[in-house]
């Protein structure tokens, strides 16, 4: 495998709107990010991914871009962005941005021109189609609910939007449009950007027949991803995208890819794959309900363990995945993946250890490093997220009570991850001096950066030790390129794997069960590298031991001989 500059890096996702507000408007900004670069450096972060900061009406929190060449004034100026790039470079850190090119905003000048002339040049930048007998061209349900087709006023035409109606899909069959997108991407890379996280990219290839599918709900519609799955040829578009942009700059790219078959992995992340890496959503997909959040199944430990370890085995033959516990589109991992008895600092450290030491590129989401959890929501009116409001309506339509629908949103809403970063126990968690754009989690006085900075045994300081171990001179090679070998898969409540190469063998073993567990080693302990219950130097595990006892929520990382 050809070695790349990003293989041994640790990444951190910032949701700018909720990170830190420095100008008192209740919204996070670029100046806030600049002011916290040293904090991120102290965590061991190499790559910072910024969720969208482009000019936008913010119907979908910036994933509806109205100008690809401008910074949203809510976040700051292009000069401040350039300063961020320069300050990151001084610290040997890389900035990547969200790249949203499946769709744009309905306020983008291309779409505005298309609306004025639905038969003109710019209409072909989108998917305008005639309706059928007064109905939309096909029966697709958008990802946010309702038809994927929106009527163009005063005409018999509709335009396609797989997300909100304010997010018209771009027509990737149009070569002129593709070239304009490539020019824009290269403009940012020329600025000094190190790469992109690429949003919803599989959706760019449509089945141009737009066939109807069997309805899968009482609304008479079918999920739009069925149309995407029936389309062929996305690889050709992705290859052209890479060759015209990323490849020229040795840029780091991480794709948001769902519905991919295991046999397609080499094409996506192999030696000459479309992307540097793709996110591993195997655990997140376990809570996909048949109809949405309201019937999302509870995640079973054995299924979760099997999903992660199986994904590791199928991936390492070809390349790297980006490992996550949570992101801006998911609820908090501590609330989602840990049983109630483990939703404490020890359990949160345990979950972090298991994720960060997997083979692949770790992505830490803002607040994960202090153990932020889901918020308590008292009313649907407290939410901002467009998807949450849609799921609430869907739950009510399916017959759930308001209390049940609200509880489902509380478990799964994206707004759980979007509550403001908890910097201190001061008003609004130190995020802003104004009214925050989204409510602050009530637990901020107990869970915040300032308090954890002072506590050597905090989740934050544990994450620092964890990342430092992964990047240490002694173990960086092993944790980057070593194999991941599942272990103790038949032992109840135990999540374990070896990271090994020709020179070393390290066991990562965690007890997710509610009772003490005991395991017999294949070998003996040479050194304790990390423990979430004691300093490694003070560990009660003896060198030479051939058995390990783990309390509930205990994780050990040991060098084995």
Located regions from the model:
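Active-site rim elements
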Residues: 168-178, 225-230, 333-346, 407-408, ...
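Hydrophobic "anchor" residues on beta-strands that sit immediately upstream
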Residues: 94, 98, 195, 252, ...
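Conserved alpha/beta catalytic core and glycan-binding cleft of carbohydrate-active enzymes
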Residues: 106-139, 143, 238, 242-420, ...
């Amino acid at each position: 495998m050809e070695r790349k500059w990003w293989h041994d890096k640790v990444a951190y996702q910032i949701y700018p709107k909720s990170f830190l507000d420095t100008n008192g408007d209740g919204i996070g900004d670029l100046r806030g990010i600049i002011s916290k670069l040293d904090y991120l450096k102290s965590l061991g972060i190499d790559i910072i991914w910024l969720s969208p900061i482009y000019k936008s009406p913010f119907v979908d929190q910036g994933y509806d871009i109205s100008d690809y060449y401008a910074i949203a004034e809510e976040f700051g100026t292009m000069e401040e962005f350039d300063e961020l790039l320069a300050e990151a470079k001084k610290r040997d850190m890389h900035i990547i941005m969200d790249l949203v090119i499946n769709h744009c905003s309905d306020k983008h000048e291309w779409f505005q021109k298309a609306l004025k002339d639905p038969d003109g040049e710019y209409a072909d930048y989108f998917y305008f189609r005639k309706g059928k007998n007064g109905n939309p061209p096909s029966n697709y349900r958008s990802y946010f609910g309702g038809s994927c087709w929106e009527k163009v006023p005063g005409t018999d035409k509709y335009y396609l939007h797989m997300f909100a109606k304010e997010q018209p899909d771009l027509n990737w069959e149009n070569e002129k449009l593709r070239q304009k997108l490539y020019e824009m991407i290269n403009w940012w890379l020329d600025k000094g950007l190190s790469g992109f996280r690429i949003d919803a990219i599989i959706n760019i290839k449509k089945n141009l027949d737009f066939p109807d599918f069997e309805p899968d709900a009482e609304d008479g519609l079918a999920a739009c991803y069925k149309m995407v799955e029936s389309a062929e040829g996305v690889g050709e578009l992705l290859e052209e995208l890479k060759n015209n942009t990323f490849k020229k700059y040795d840029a780091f790219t991480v794709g948001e890819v769902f519905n991919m078959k295991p046999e397609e992995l080499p094409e996506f992340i192999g030696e000459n794959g479309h992307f540097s890496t793709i996110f591993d959503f195997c655990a997140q997909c376990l809570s996909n309900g048949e109809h949405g959040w309201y019937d999302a199944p509870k995640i079973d430990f054995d299924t979760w363990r099997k999903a992660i370890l199986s994904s590791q085995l199928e991936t390492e033959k070809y390349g790297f995945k980006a490992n996550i516990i949570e992101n801006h589109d998911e609820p908090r991992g501590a609330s989602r993946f840990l049983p109630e008895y483990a939703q404490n600092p020890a359990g949160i450290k345990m979950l972090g250890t298991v994720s960060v030491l997997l083979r692949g590129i770790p992505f830490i989401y803002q607040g994960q490093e202090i153990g932020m959890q889901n918020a308590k929501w008292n009313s649907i009116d407290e939410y901002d997220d467009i998807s949450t409001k849609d799921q609430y309506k869907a739950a009510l339509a399916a017959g759930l009570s308001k209390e049940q629908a609200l509880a489902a949103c509380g478990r799964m809403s994206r707004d759980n991850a979007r509550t403001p970063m908890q910097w201190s126990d001061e008003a609004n968690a130190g995020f802003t001096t104004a009214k925050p754009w989204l409510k602050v989690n009530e637990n901020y006085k107990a869970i915040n950066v300032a308090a954890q900075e002072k506590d050597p045994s905090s989740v934050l300081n544990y994450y620092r030790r964890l990342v430092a171990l992964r990047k240490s001179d002694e173990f960086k090679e092993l944790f980057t390129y070593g194999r991941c070998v599942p272990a103790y898969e038949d032992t109840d409540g135990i999540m374990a794997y070896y990271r090994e190469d020709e020179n070393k063998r390290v066991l990562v073993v965690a007890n997710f069960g509610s009772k003490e567990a005991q395991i017999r080693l294949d070998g003996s302990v040479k050194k304790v590298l990390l423990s979430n219950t004691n300093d490694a130097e003070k560990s009660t595990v003896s060198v030479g031991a051939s058995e390990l006892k783990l309390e509930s929520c205990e994780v050990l990382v040991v060098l084995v001989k």
